[in-house]
Amino acid sequence: MKPILTFLTALLFPVLIDLSSAEDLTVYPPVPGLAASEHYKVRVRAVADGAVWQGAFAIQTACKSLENGTDGYFDTLAGWTHTYVNFETAGAVEIEIARANGQPIHSAAAHPQRKASSCSVKNGRAFVRLDQPCLVAVDIDGRMDTQDTGKGYNGPPLHTISIFANPPLRGKPMPDDRGVLYVKPGVIPPSDGPWTTLYFLPGVHDIGLAFPLRANRQYYIPGDAMVYGTLSNRKWGDAHHIRIFGLGTLSG
């Protein structure tokens, strides 16, 4: 999973944003109304004297069982989960990964390996150091590295984790900025009107299928917002100068 902006997607992905601590590190609070990962807990801190650990909200997406032939699920992946965290950093950071159930981690490996300056296990927890913003997956206890999980795999569900250490996002709107229409969770926003920016407030949103995008507009999803639905534009000549950004999640 990568934070790539895409229209009409059926994948869950983190879009690109803000909120919390040290000068070079921005960690987001939990998404109101969204359960944290059942499998992992994550903390992060800047690599600097006196830096303190901050809890990073771990979001989980799960594979369902096959319900019909067109939903894109596979029964062999039922119960698999992926956990991910988003934060912003301008410098080096250290990430701590622990199992949510308190059981110890025995081994860990970051991929791509070249992106992590170190990856180790201490006292049953994994520690990853990143010297600059990057995206890495961390294989816990060799679940993906030491076995073939391709076609024919019939073992227990696997639970993977990724770290999205994004560069600082500039130009974030504020809910009270001129031209900004803020959207509360549970409210379907208007697809048009006297606004230039839709700002999804912290929480869980559902915009339904094919929410219309408009030219010369931007759509902002902060790191503590989850937006379910898809975005589309079917109006000829209206699909230009559209920006979707923030480090929240758009799940189609």
Question: What positions do the PLM features span?
Answer:
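Bacterial N-terminal signal peptides
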Residues: 6-18
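Short hydrophobic beta-strand that contains or immediately precedes a catalytic carboxylate
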Residues: 199-200, 220-221, 231
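A mature extracytoplasmic/lumenal domain signature
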Residues: 142, 202-204, 223-225, 248
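Beta-strand-enriched, solvent-exposed domains that form extended recognition/catalytic surfaces
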Residues: 23-179
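Extracellular beta-strand-rich solenoid/capping regions of secreted or surface-exposed proteins
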Residues: 128-130, 190-193, 205-218, 226-245, ...
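Structural motif
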Residues: 135-137, 196-198, 218, 225
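N-terminal domain-start segments of secreted/luminal proteins
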Residues: 167-217
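Positively charged n-region of N-terminal signal peptides that target proteins for export
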Residues: 1-4
